[in-house]
């Protein structure tokens, strides 16, 4: 369960209040969508939910976020610069201690991503936006997780992948 109490988030650059006095409890198994216009704090709220102790230079906040230290999946809007320079081989196999390979290959098949590419030396930076999202979904969902945080998951997504994601979220 995740519990948010009296959370107010302020953007420190322009002192704009992004979230005001939010109170929310998310029960185990519950699905929540954060919907709003661009630039109004959805990603900032999500970043704090993923890591309430994170120091975010552009934000200040008051209130409490309580959540267990259970494993989680976080797929940001854009893949980080540090991951862009990795090869697919390194991305999928350099840190494998908790990967479930059966799930990894099943997800690759379901998302129409050729699993033979896992071992390639292709740089992540050369992938299309949709392929970058697919590799994140494949790898992260093949790890143990109790929470899944997706930031703008439909960006760069083709119709087939969007349909897959909707079905995944429903079940």
Model-derived features with residue positions:
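A short, flexible loop at the N-terminus of ABC-type nucleotide-binding domains that lies
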Residues: 1-4, 8-22, 28-30, 57-60
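ABC-family P-loop ATPase nucleotide-binding domains
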Residues: 10-12, 70-71, 76-135, 139, ...
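Short loop/turn elements that form and flank the Walker-type P-loop nucleotide-binding site
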Residues: 28, 68-70, 143-145, 171
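Conserved phosphate-binding and hydrolysis motifs of nucleotide-dependent enzymes
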Residues: 29, 36-41, 130, 151-152
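ABC ATPase nucleotide-binding domain signature region
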Residues: 31-37, 43-100
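Catalytic Walker B motif of ABC-type/P-loop ATPase nucleotide-binding domains
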Residues: 148-152, 165
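Walker B catalytic motif
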Residues: 152-153, 158
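Helical segment within the ABC ATPase nucleotide-binding domain
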Residues: 162-171
């Amino acid at each position: 369960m995740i519990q948010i109490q009296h959370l107010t988030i302020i953007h420190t650059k322009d002192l704009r209040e992004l979230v005001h006095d939010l109170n929310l409890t998310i029960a185990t198994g519950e699905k929540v969508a954060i919907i709003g216009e661009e630039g109004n704090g959805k990603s900032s709220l999500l970043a704090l939910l993923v890591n309430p102790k994170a120091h975010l230079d552009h934000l200040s906040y008051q209130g409490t976020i309580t959540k267990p230290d259970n494993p989680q999946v976080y797929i940001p809007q854009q893949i980080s610069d540090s991951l862009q320079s990795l090869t697919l081989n390194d991305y999928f196999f350099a840190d494998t201690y908790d990967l479930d390979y059966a799930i990894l290959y099943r997800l690759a098949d379901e998302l129409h991503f050729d699993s033979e590419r896992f071992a390639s030396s292709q740089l992540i930076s050369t992938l299309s936006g949709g392929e970058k999202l697919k590799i994140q979904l494949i790898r992260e969902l093949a790890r143990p997780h109790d929470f899944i945080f997706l930031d703008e998951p439909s960006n760069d997504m083709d119709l087939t992948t969007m349909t897959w994601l909707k079905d995944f979220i429903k079940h």
